[in-house]
Every structure is written in structure tokens, then in C-alpha cells.
Amino acid sequence: RVGQTATSGQQAARYGQVSPQQVAGLEQQYAAPSAVNVDRGRMTYDDVIMRTAAMFGVIVAVGALTWNLATSPATSGIGMMVMMAGAIGALVLGLVNSFKREPSPVLILAYAACEGAMLGAFSGVMELAYPGIVLQAVLGTLAVFAVMLAAYKVAGFRVSGKAARILLLAMGGYLIFSLVNFLLMVTGVVSDPWGLRGVTVAGIPLGLVIGALAVVMAAFSLAMDFESIQRGVERGLPTRYAWAGAFGLTVTLVWLYVEILRILAILRGDD
């Protein structure tokens, strides 16, 4: 009977009919879950979240070390040197990672380490001068992130076309200003601890105006990051591109945090 069943099955298939064995096989295939990105080695939202968490893990770990260096009287000088080295390293690696065709996890995590070195020391010094300011900056950053995510998901807020080009030009101009300001501070041309940001115009520190514009630019950049990540997932990009999404998101969040921290410091410094 087994032989007859097999033969009849072959004959049925040969004449375009479906045998009982084929029916069972098809039912199993239809019952199986459809292939998702993770099954095909494609980028998923979870991939981006995990890699972003890894980057912030590195930032926090390294930042804790440089925080202690910068806030300890015995090692504060070393802490400042590490902060400067971290800032330069983050700038260089940030540019390298931005222009690489393929994301490099090693270089991206190295960038996170440099950011941690800079952020830890900078945050520690600010916390010593203005207790509670770091928590305020963190909460402010999270609030902006939550608002922009809600605007993107619920209200359909997008930054594209002409608006995106204007934003990129504005960010380029801001980068040039920041580099010039940094050089003026390092060389001692400007004595104010905030550099050109400490200049007062009509009684208002220039740093507040520039900082507010920077926060708006960073917030809009978050929307662009969200859209870039969504496109990557929908197009089924390889998993390695989740590192690119995590890198872009981390860069924007760090920028946003620094700007909010600086604004708060300027405001509290005027008290």
C-alpha cells in the first residue's frame, strides 16, 4: 500500500494534481510565519536600538572614568587633557564615519569612546559648578527626543526636500562657527570661557541665541535620523547598516545634550 500511495502521488503530481503528501507540505508552509528581516539578515529596528544602546554604554563607561578624573583635584589637569583629546578624536572619527561608504563597528565604537571621554569630563566640570545641571540636561534631551519621535510617528512630521537642504546648510555653517570658536578659545584670542558665545548682544548672551538655534537644528536632525532608519528597514538593507543608523542617532543626541547643557550653564551663570 505504501508503494501504491507513493506511485499514485507521483502520478497525481505529474498530471497537475495535488497529492495528500503535497497538501500536508503546503499546509505546513502556509502555517509557518512569514520571513522577516531578521530571518534574512536584514536591518531591523531592534538592530538599531541594540547598537545605539551599545554606543551609549561605551559613552557612559568611558564618561564615568573621565568624570572622576576631571572632578578630582589631584587629576583635574589630566581630565582636561583627556577631554580635549576626546573632543578632537570625536570630531575626526565623526567625519570619517560620516563619509565612509560602509559602516565600521570598530570606528563607530571608537567614536563613542572619544565622545565619552569628552562628555564625562565636560559634564563633571559643569556639575561641580552648577549642581543638578547634568540631570536637567539629560531630561531636556529625553524630552526633545520624545516630542520629535511622537511628531514623526503620530503627526507625520518630516524634514525633506528644500527644508532638508536648508537644514544641512545651516548645520554646515554652525560647524564652521564651532571650529572657529574652538580655535579662538584654545589660542587665547578670546578670553571668555564660552568664546564667542559669551559675547553679549543687546544684553543677551550670543550663546543663548546660537544654542537655541542649535537645539532646533538638532531636533530636526532627529526627524531625519528617524526617516533614514525607517527607509533602511523598509528597503531591507543588510544588518551592518544598523550601525550607520545608530551612529547618526547617537551623534544627534550627543549634540542635543551638549547644546542644552551649555544653554543651562549660561543661564545659571548669569544668576
Where do the model's predicted regions map?
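A hydrophobic alpha-helical transmembrane-helix feature that marks the membrane cores
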Residues: 1-271
